[in-house]
A protein has these predicted regions:
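C-terminal motif of bacterial Sec signal peptides marking the signal peptidase cleavage site
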Residues: 19-22
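Extended ligand-binding regions for polar small-molecule ligands
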Residues: 65-75, 136, 143-146, 150-154, ...
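Bilobed "Venus flytrap"/periplasmic-binding protein-like clamshell domains
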Residues: 46-49, 58-73, 129-186, 205-207
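Periplasmic-binding protein-like
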Residues: 45-46, 124-132, 215-252, 274-285
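A ligand-binding cleft/hinge motif common to bilobed small-molecule-binding domains
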Residues: 89, 95, 105-115, 163-167, ...
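Acidic, polar ligand-binding/catalytic clefts
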Residues: 81-145
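Extracytoplasmic small-molecule ligand-binding "clamshell" domains
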Residues: 31-106, 182
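Ligand-binding clefts/hinges and TM-proximal coupling segments of bilobed small-molecule sensing domains
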Residues: 28, 78-81, 158-180, 253-285
């Protein structure tokens, strides 16, 4: 009799635990319609401030990251896990399927279309410019830079900034920028210019502001010696793994909803100090 009661108690306890686990799993893994939630890994370059970085509390943030958080809120069928990593690991990881999507202030290039899915809707806008010494502040664009015969900080061939300069050179064969492919993905442009190793370099405005104009930045002491001159505003994109077309399509629908509001404008102002969407009509790339 005692053994029978013990067996009955064990069976009841096991059933109760099973029900609790099932309920718990159901809440975490299904939508309000009872459909399964797809968990996806969103990689971000953790050193790409203000586009993608880790804040003082250890949380992922930046323009690209915050937009993807809004996308996550809209997409009930998906659950995002943000994974901070390096630029190289992001590119390799998304291509190989370690991550389903990656954000890193990425520009579109023909080469990248062979490795990643580019969605229909862009993620944001980024200001690209020339960093030069104050005495060369009259150099406003790539044409000025080329005409002056200035030397440019090297850019890795797989860096989309290299493609931007290469496209300019192709369109201007008689006034080309001296473009040198670097071994590293990017170099410390401000340092190279300040030391006189080159006459100028290409940098994203957000990065320049964080390094030079922001109090406490590593080169804030050079704020009166180094200048940034914007030469283009360029669309930026999330990079999806080649097998994630359905996910990319879902992203497109969510971003379309967000673009009908002022959410992206506000994030641009928050992280870049200005609403880059105001010049969207003049963006060529």
């Amino acid at each position: 009799m005692l053994i029978k009661k013990i067996l009955q108690f064990t069976a009841i306890s096991f059933a109760a635990v099973s029900i609790l686990v099932a309920c718990s799993d159901g809440e975490a893994a299904t939508t309000s319609n009872g459909e399964a939630v797809k968990k996806v890994k969103v990689a971000y370059d953790q050193s790409g401030k203000p586009m993608t970085y880790i804040d003082e509390n250890g949380n992922p943030t930046g323009y690209d990251v915050e937009v993807m958080k809004l996308v996550d809120e809209i997409l009930e069928d998906y659950e995002f896990e943000f994974v901070g990593t390096s630029n190289d690991d992001l590119l390799i990881g998304v291509e190989q399927g370690k991550y389903q999507v990656g954000v890193k202030n990425a520009f579109w290039t023909e080469e990248r279309t062979a490795k990643f899915i580019f969605p229909q809707e862009f993620l944001g806008l980024s200001s690209a410019g020339l960093v030069v010494k104050k005495e060369n502040a009259h150099i406003k664009n790539l044409s000025d830079f080329a005409s002056a015969g200035f030397t440019l900080a090297p850019i890795a061939a797989n860096n989309a900034q290299y493609t931007v300069i290469a496209e300019y050179n192709e369109a201007n064969p008689d006034n080309q920028v001296k473009l040198q492919a670097g071994e590293e993905f990017s170099v410390d442009v401000v340092q190279w210019v300040n030391e006189g190793r080159v006459d100028g370099g290409v940098q994203i405005e957000g990065s320049f502001n964080g390094q030079v104009l922001t109090e406490g930045g590593p080169y804030h002491h050079l704020k009166d010696e180094i200048v940034y001159n914007e030469f283009a505003v360029i669309k930026t994109w999330p990079l999806f793994n080649k097998k994630e077309q359905e996910f990319a399509d879902a992203y497109d629908k969510a971003i379309q909803q967000l673009k009908e509001t002022d959410a992206l404008n506000k994030l641009s102002e928050q992280f870049y100090g200005k609403d880059l969407f105001k010049v969207l009509d003049s963006v060529k790339r």
